[in-house]
């Protein structure tokens, strides 16, 4: 997945689940997740892997 593809997956999932829940489950800071979702930042590889695993396996 690319950063943009993962961002789109997060946007879709955030319509069903609270973003704070996703942050807690993945261990990614809610502010980092928010900035990523808004396209202001790209995730570091280790955070990308955590979020990708969560969004593609659940």
Where are these regions (language model features)?
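Recognition helix of helix-turn-helix/homeodomain-like DNA-binding domains
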Residues: 28-43
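DNA major-groove recognition helix of helix-turn-helix/homeodomain DNA-binding modules
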Residues: 44-58
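Short alpha-helical "recognition helix" segments of helix-turn-helix
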Residues: 21-25
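Alpha-solenoid HEAT/Armadillo repeat architecture
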Residues: 11, 15, 38-41, 56
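A short, Lys/Arg-rich alpha-helix, primarily the initiator
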Residues: 1-16
């Amino acid at each position: 997945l690319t950063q943009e593809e993962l961002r789109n997956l997060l946007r879709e999932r955030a319509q069903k689940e609270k973003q704070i829940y996703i942050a807690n489950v993945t261990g990614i800071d809610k502010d980092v997740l928010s900035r990523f979702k808004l396209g202001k930042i790209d995730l570091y590889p280790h955070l990308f892997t955590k979020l990708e695993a969560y969004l593609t396996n659940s």
